[in-house]
Amino acid sequence: MTFDIKRLPDERDAVAPDGSDVRILLRLDSGSMAHFELAPGRTSGAVAHRTVEEIWYVMQGRGEMWRKHENREEVVTIEPGVCLSIPAGTQFQFRSLGSEPLAAIAITMPPWPGPGEAYVVAGKWPQTEWDR
């Protein structure tokens, strides 16, 4: 067993399938943690996850999150202090509505398995196009 520690990296590690910047934090056998950031005025792509579920905690910015699973669909306001769940198979999309980036920490259970986990779905809003 080891004890891990890591600071939030200054540079992104990857771009998520939804288009947000990802900074990978820590990983254990049962889950992983990452920081997601979406620039002001941007709208993510809409995706769903095949096998993982997530818990998000919003740290900065303000925006909206669309979630749809089977016959339930909602749009919620997200801002610092808001925590929400994204069960496996849930379609979701988010957008940054403020003047600062929308930033959240997400716990993924089980750990993110890699390419192919997220798949594109039809979203609530048009995705913002930009060079990455």
Predicted feature locations:
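A short, N-terminal "cap"/entry segment at the start of jelly-roll beta-barrel domains
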Residues: M1-H35, G45-A46, G116-R132
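A short beta-loop-beta micro-motif enriched in histidine and acidic residues
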Residues: D21-S32, G41-Y57, N71-R72, P80
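Short beta-strand His + acidic residue motifs that chelate non-heme Fe in jelly-roll/DSBH
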Residues: G45-V47, M65-W66, I86, F92-S99
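A short hydrophobic beta-strand segment most commonly corresponding to one strand
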Residues: I55, S99-E117
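Short acidic-glycine-tyrosine-enriched beta hairpin
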Residues: E70-A88
